[in-house]
Each structure stands twice: as C-alpha cells, then as structure tokens.
Amino acid sequence: MLRIPIKRALIGLSNSPKGYVRTTGTAASNLIEVFVDGQSVMVEPGTTVLQACEKVGMQIPRFCYHERLSVAGNCRMCLVEIEKAPKVVAACAMPVMKGWNILTNSEKSKKAREGVMEFLLANHPLDCPICDQGGECDLQDQSMMFGSDRSRFLEGKRAVEDKNIGPLVKTIMTRCIQCTRCIRFASEIAGVDDLGTTGRGNDMQVGTYIEKMFMSELSGNVIDICPVGALTSKPYAFTARPWETRKTESIDVMDAVGSNIVVSTRTGEVMRILPRMHEDINEEWISDKTRFAYDGLKRQRLTEPMVRNEKGLLTYTSWEDALSRVAGMLQNFEGNAVAAIAGGLVDAEALVALKDLLNKVDSDNLCTEEIFPTEGAGTDLRSNYLLNTTIAGVEEADVVLLVGTNPRFEAPLFNARIRKSWLHNDLKVALIGSPVDLTYRYDHLGDSPKILQDIASGRHSFCEVLKDAKKPMVVLGSSALQRDDGAAILVAVSNMVQKIRVTTGVAAEWKVMNILHRIASQVAALDLGYKPGVEAIRKNPPKMLFLLGADGGCITRQDLPKDCFIVYQGHHGDVGAPMADVILPGAAYTEKSATYVNTEGRAQQTKVAVTPPGLAREDWKIIRALSEIAGITLPYDTLDQVRNRLEEVSPNLVRYDDIEETNYFQQASELAKLVNQEVLADPLVPPQLTIKDFYMTDSISRASQTMAKCVKAVTEGAQAVEEPSIC
C-alpha cells in the first residue's frame, strides 16, 4: 500500500495540487455533476468521492486519510456505495464520475464500515481507561458511531513490542491500526525516512526497524495525526485528560515564525501545547521545541523581586523596596548614561513602555541583543528587515536561494513550506553557506559571501537558473548579518536582488528580498526604533543598564564599569539575572496578553493562559509602576492604552494578523551605495548547524528538562534517556 506514495515523495513528484485541497487527476475547466444521497453537487474532474461528500457537509469516517498527506487507502473505513456499482468503493481514493449517485448511509455502506471496524477492534487492546488518547480518539468515536454493539472475536489478541524512538514520542504499538499516517508525515512533511513498515498482514509493524531516535524537529506532530493511542506524548503521559483542561488560543515565541498554538492548562499549570490551524503561517504543524519546551516555564523561574546586599548576594525583597531602589538610581542619571538591552522573548508592549521610560530621562540608548546592519538603508526601511514574500508565498516561488541560514532548525515551519513547494511544485533550491542537512535537495553554491557578488555581476553559473525564474526568492539568514561584514553582505544581497529584477521577468509586485529572523522580539523592536546590537553600549558604557529579558550573553559584567547599576527584568534566572543588582520578576508568554511580530511583519497576540508565579507581574506594568515611583509617570494605565501608544509609534503593531505592503527596495539599493561593500572571504556558518543546536536556544528551552533529554538522546542515543514504562 505504501510503495506508490513513498516513491512519489522520494522522486519529488506530486500527487496533489498546491495548497491543501487534493485531487487525483488533472482538473478540467468544466465542472461535472454528481449526487450525494440524492443531493446535487458540482465538482471538478478528479475530485474524490470523499471530497465531493465533504462539499455538501457529509462527513465520511476515515483513519488513514489526511488532507495534507498522500492517499494510502489502506484502512477501508471510508467505504461507500455507488448506485448501480457492484461493490462498495474507498471514498478517499476513488475519483468521481459524471452522474454518480453516492450513497453514504445505505445498508451496504453501513455493513461495510461495521465489518472494517470489527477487524480493527479484533486486535486492539482494551486500554481506553489508561490510554492518553482517551477523549480525543478517532477509534473510540468511530467505533461508537459506525461499529457493532457486540464482538464475535474470541481468540487471543496479538501484542507488539514497543519501540523507543526518543524522549518525545511514546509508542504503544499494540494499539497501532497500521493507518501509516506517521510514515507518510515523516516522509512527505518532515522529510525524514526514519519510520516504515516491516512484515505483512497480521505481522505488519510500524517502526524504525533498527531501534533509534526519530530524528526530526517536527516529530511531535505524529502524535496529533495518529488516530489512536499508538503514538502519544511522553512528557504529557498520565498527567491529564482533555476534558479536564482549559484551552487558550495563543502564539509561539520560540522562533520568529509565530506559529499559532493552543495552550492547555489545569489548576494554573501548563499541561501541554498543541498546534492551531493557520494556513498562512504554520498550517496545522508546530516544531518540537514549541510543543515540548513548556516544562521550562516551571523551572528556574524568578518569582520575587531581589536586590544585591552588602555582601554581594541577591536576597528577596518587596516590590516597594526593589522599585524604590531602581527609581532612586534612575533619578541620578540622564541621557545616555542610562541604557537598555531587550532580549529575544520580549513583547511589543514592554518594548514601547521601556522606550518611553528612557525617553523621559532623555536617553535613546535602546538596543537589542541581535545585531542588524544600520548602514545604508539599515532599519529605516521596513522592507530591509522582513520576510517580504511571506511564509505562504514560498509556495508560489520557483527558485529559492538560501544565504547563510539553516531554515530547518532556525524556522522549522518555514522549512516545511519550502519542502512542500519543492515536493509538489518543482521548486529549485540553492544554498550559499556551510552545507547543512535540509529536508530537500539543493545546489550548494559554496560557503563564501563573495559568491553573491559573482551572481550580481552575472559571472556565476547560477545566473542561468535565475534567468528563467518568474518568482525567485532570496532568503538571507539574520545570523549572516551579525558578522563584521554584515552590512556589506546585506548590500551584496540587495544589489543581487536588483540585478535579478532587471535581468529576469519578475513582476513588480513580487518581493524577492527576504530576511529570516530567529528570535520573536526582533521585528517589533526594530519597528519601535531600537538599535540592533550592543556595540554602542560597549563603546560608551552606561552608569545604569536595564536588561529586559536579555539572556543571550551579548554583554558581560566585564564590559561595564564596576559602578554600573544593572536591573534585570525577566522571567527566568538564566544568563542575565546573575549580573543584576536588582531583579524584577516578569511574566512569560503564556502568562500575559501581549503582542509579537513575526519575521514576515505579522502582528499577533498571546493570551493569558495561567497567572504568573509568585509575585511576578507583566513587564509593561512593572515599567509603568517604576515610572510613577521615579516621578516620570508614563501616560497609560491599561493594556488598551499601551496599545494605543503602540499605534502612535508604529501603527502596524496593532493591525493583528495583517501584513503591510513593503515596496522600498529601489530606495534601499540606492542607499546601499553609501556602504563599504567589501565582503570577507570567511565562510557563512549558521549558528544552528545540527539538530543538537535546535533544542536549547532561549531561557525557556534551556530550563526545560525535556529539551535537555533531547540533546542527550541526539548525542548519546535514545537509550541514554530511556525510562521504565508503567504501561
């Protein structure tokens, strides 16, 4: 059953059109009429019986079919009767023909489904009371709806040995119904061939053949698509039932993609994180870091204000004392003697509040941890630092050139889009930078940034590929811009993009230039006028420094004067907190309603799922309280008022789920002429080369035991983190 779909995936042929609606043939211009239980519906030729039924709102039961995966047709649960046909047909795989009358609830259809369900349940264990899939199990629901009320099976049930495929996905393979969704997901979406089947008939098993870790940054998604309890979450095992939890729609901040998520909580604790559908960003997938790093929200948290005593030790204190100390110091300095550094997990509301606070003392010394060139157009033009084509726009591109980036681990969901387009749309991919293990074939052009200048001048062989491109896309990794020649690299890419526009038939509305960011706060910070990088602080060390969630280690105590007063405000005791003279505990992304802007410039909101631990408070509220004690009260008291202020400074920050048009590429190219354009020959090396570098990149994931287990499993093998099962 699997050979044809997997073969298609491996050779890059498509058995589905672009997007997520799939047909099995070429769509003609004329619609054809079919009938579903006597109801007329017009569909395109090649539409399957199942799709035609869904068009009129008729749900057909299925286990193996998934709208984003190839058709396997091996569970047979979707059998329906076609009027005047001798036998029932598999609705997921059979294309409709003109005039067909599909009978979804005939006696023949019901009997067929009942028979299939009986065979599925024959070997399925009665684990429902102890199965983590209970309450959201397709087999439970469909056996109730379409199965028989009694069993005729009296023999012994078969049992299958469980597989250890790592610290994230728990396997109880006796429950497996061989739908092969996990195999097709791994091969087609994740781009790894770790999963497969062995044996046949009653002896068929799904697994890795040789016991090893399921090595993918998207592996947790097999938990969602598994229709039974064969694949479940190891960290979530035996902790809660779905009906006990409260679901809060939010967004992820582990990278700059802004994946939509659902945070499940119980009694003030995050129990698990699931994906939420958003066609333009993450479809219905999320990365493993997004899904499993939530246990880091419970560890190494800052729960009370702290001050450094005479002995140099940090001790707990009250909010009044901590804020009074900070306010007293703030009143002693003004101008650029006061500075601030914003970290990667900071929300836009806190960024604008801190900006207003420092502006009140005549300081504009506001920096981000991430470096971005400010020469030429720099950050003055928004199109200069965004993924202008958008994430979904990758599906329209015909050529993608990756420069100094590894999207597989920097932005896994963006990488999944590239693979989807490569698989289905014959996308050509090339890479300039260190060779990395991507999930699709690519042409490695070399690792020197000088290749950019060769392409711009027309001397490189890749120019022939670009000449034929109608919708080329250049993706420049933000880490490539953090080198000493970052500005020259940005100019080289900008010049190359303009040359592509001149020499090819690229439409004026198509955006070629794209920057792929790695951290969630960077775009909002640049929108609000923060200076990228901390070089200005190193050159002119301040007397007072605010570290707002700054845990990247971009500045150390040795870079600052001994008498510099440091205030750390954040939610984890990570890199920044030990440097501080005063610590102000803030709220994590699951504990506040906050605005984040993703790499394509799309503003989105997190929602309050749980309350902050201990005495921790939302960041903008802490800054507002500090301003009042310091006698420079900020002009807002509520979240709505803060967002009104956001709109004054940068209106796009409150246009939620909307992308503003960016078209200032010609102006950026002209300003680039003012920049030193000499690039170094040093190779472009992305910071996240392997999957080991993917798991622990911020204060939350570094505090996560699950992420630490993943790193150990990758380096030492899945057996190194194997835990005894109680089930």
UniProtKB/Swiss-Prot annotation:
Binding site for [4Fe-4S] cluster 1: H124, C128, C131, C137
UniProt keyword Oxidoreductase present: yes
Manner of cofactor binding, per the entry note: Binds 1 [2Fe-2S] cluster per subunit. Binds 2 [4Fe-4S] clusters per subunit.
Cofactor(s) the protein requires to work: [2Fe-2S] cluster; [4Fe-4S] cluster
Record's subcellular location: Mitochondrion inner membrane
GO molecular function, one term: electron transfer activity
Gene3D superfamilies: 3.10.20.740, 3.30.200.210, 3.30.70.20, 3.40.50.740
Transit peptide: 1-23
InterPro entries assigned to the protein according to its UniProt record, in alphabetical order: 2Fe-2S_ferredoxin-like_sf, 2Fe-2S_ferredoxin-type, Mopterin_OxRdtase, Mopterin_OxRdtase_4Fe-4S_dom, NADH_UbQ_OxRdtase_75kDa_su_CS, NADH_UbQ_OxRdtase_ferredoxin, NADH_UbQ_OxRdtase_Gsu, NADH_UbQ_OxRdtase_Gsu_4Fe4S-bd
EC number of this enzyme: 7.1.1.2
Record-listed Phosphoserine modification sites: S461
GO CC aspect terms: mitochondrial inner membrane; mitochondrial intermembrane space; mitochondrion; myelin sheath; respiratory chain complex I
SMART domains: NADH-G_4Fe-4S_3
Record-listed [4Fe-4S] cluster 2 binding positions: C176, C179, C182, C226
Tissue: Brain. More abundant in neurons than in astrocytes (at protein level).
SUBUNIT field: Core subunit of respiratory chain NADH dehydrogenase (Complex I) which is composed of 45 different subunits. This is the largest subunit of complex I and it is a component of the iron-sulfur (IP) fragment of the enzyme. Complex I associates with ubiquinol-cytochrome reductase complex (Complex III) to form supercomplexes. In astrocytes, less complex I is assembled into supercomplexes as compared to neurons. Interacts with MDM2. Interacts with AKAP1.
Family under the similarity heading: Belongs to the complex I 75 kDa subunit family.
Alphabetized NCBIfam families for the sequence: NuoG
Function: Core subunit of the mitochondrial membrane respiratory chain NADH dehydrogenase (Complex I) which catalyzes electron transfer from NADH through the respiratory chain, using ubiquinone as an electron acceptor. Essential for catalysing the entry and efficient transfer of electrons within complex I. Plays a key role in the assembly and stability of complex I and participates in the association of complex I with ubiquinol-cytochrome reductase complex (Complex III) to form supercomplexes.
Name by which UniProt lists this protein: NADH-ubiquinone oxidoreductase 75 kDa subunit, mitochondrial
Organism of derivation: Mus musculus (Mouse)
Gene designation per UniProt: Ndufs1
